[in-house]
């Protein structure tokens, strides 16, 4: 079946459809990972976005549910140069086409992803629309233009838990994880380190968290503009300095906002598992997995914060600690899923901090 992709600047490309036989709307972003497409498709941080892979052949090893980062596919659409129709891997349960059909998500292949990546890199992320079948070019471009900006949509509410959920480990530490769109890899890394988790919705009141008397609080990753997630910002503001706290990705941005800093939208975001991060304490450079469209504005950080890590590509903030109380955050994804394991140590630091202040 025919398909088409339109961008808000009038770019129009024709290709072949796969996945759900319906259209899709979202902000198009490119991901530079060569593998890990299953984890990316199921990452809640991609909610509201059409995901395009820069690697030209996707789907070779199929799909395995053990690699899911959530309860299903979260992207609004999937764009690839070429889709493998006959995956071959002993773990494979289905193809990418079958996965997208199952979760009613459209895809398009056969478009020039290299050209699109260069365009987004030069002009920034854009609103986009996928059309299936006989598509009217002008109407599809209009759909791309007229959809709301990602900054105007409350995306976290669409991907977080609706009631508290419990995960038990073989340890004795108790942590409340505020779910803004948490990846299962984060949950698994904490459980491995003897942390029992109570996962609560993003708007769970700070007072109720205090009543639970946890050893620590953890603010998760998630999609969209951090400035829209006001309930979590308020929770962080009330709990910071009283309970040891950590944040990842969106949680990092929300923590900065709660304590007086500002955030801004990146030109085309960081999406992929090959982002270099420099750690100032050790002087080492780590390769990290990242998925975010916003960043913390260094110039607005209160003096109580110390920037511990930066991105070597654009020098944006990648890590922070508070000088006066136990609070650590990182912009990248230390749990990987997918990506290198260079930064697993973040979870060790968090657990050490919990035990120190217990």
Swiss-Prot record:
Enumerate the residue ranges of region (CPSase).
1-172
- So what EC number does this one have? 6.3.5.5
Domain Glutamine amidotransferase type-1, chain residue ranges per copy: 174-358
Q: Which UniProt keywords apply?
A: Amino-acid biosynthesis, Arginine biosynthesis, ATP-binding, Glutamine amidotransferase, Ligase, Nucleotide-binding, Pyrimidine biosynthesis
Q: What class of enzyme is it?
A: ligase
Protein family membership: Belongs to the CarA family.
This chain's protein is named Carbamoyl phosphate synthase small chain
Taxonomy-wise, where does this protein's organism fall, top ranks first? Archaea, Methanobacteriati, Methanobacteriota, Archaeoglobi, Archaeoglobales
- Encoding gene, per UniProt annotation: carA
């Amino acid at each position: 079946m025919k398909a088409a992709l339109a961008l808000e600047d009038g770019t129009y490309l024709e290709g072949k459809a796969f996945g759900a036989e319906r259209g899709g709307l979202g902000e198009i972003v490119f991901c530079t990972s060569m593998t890990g497409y299953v984890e990316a498709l199921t990452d809640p941080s991609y909610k509201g976005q059409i995901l395009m892979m820069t690697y030209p052949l996707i789907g070779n090893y199929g799909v395995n549910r053990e690699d899911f980062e959530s309860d299903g596919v979260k992207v609004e659409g999937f764009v690839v140069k070429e889709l493998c129709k006959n995956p071959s891997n002993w773990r494979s349960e289905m193809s990418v086409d079958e996965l997208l059909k199952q979760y009613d998500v459209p895809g398009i292949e056969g478009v020039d992803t290299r050209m699109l990546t260069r365009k987004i890199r030069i002009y920034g992320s854009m609103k986009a629309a996928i059309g299936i079948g006989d598509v009217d070019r002008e109407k599809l471009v209009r759909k791309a233009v007229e959809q709301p900006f990602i900054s105007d949509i409350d995306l976290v509410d669409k991907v977080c838990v609706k009631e508290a959920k419990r995960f038990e480990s073989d340890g004795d530490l108790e942590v409340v994880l505020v779910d803004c769109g948490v990846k299962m890899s984060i949950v698994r890394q904490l459980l491995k380190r003897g942390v029992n988790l109570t996962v609560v919705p993003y708007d769970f009141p700070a007072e109720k968290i205090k009543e639970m008397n946890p050893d620590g609080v953890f603010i998760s990753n998630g999609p969209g503009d951090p400035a829209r997630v006001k309930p979590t910002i308020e929770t962080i503001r009330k709990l910071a300095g009283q309970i040891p706290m950590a944040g990842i990705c969106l949680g990092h941005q929300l923590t900065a906002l709660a304590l007086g800093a500002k955030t801004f939208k990146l030109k085309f975001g960081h999406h992929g598992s090959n982002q270099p991060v420099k750690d100032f304490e050790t002087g080492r450079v780590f390769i990290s997995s990242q998925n975010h469209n916003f960043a913390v504005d260094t110039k607005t950080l209160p003096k109580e914060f110390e920037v511990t890590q930066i991105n070597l590509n654009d020098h944006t903030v990648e890590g922070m600690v508070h000088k006066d109380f136990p609070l650590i955050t990182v912009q990248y994804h230390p749990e990987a899923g997918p990506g290198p394991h260079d930064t697993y140590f973040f979870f060790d630091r968090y657990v050490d901090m919990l035990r120190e202040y217990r």
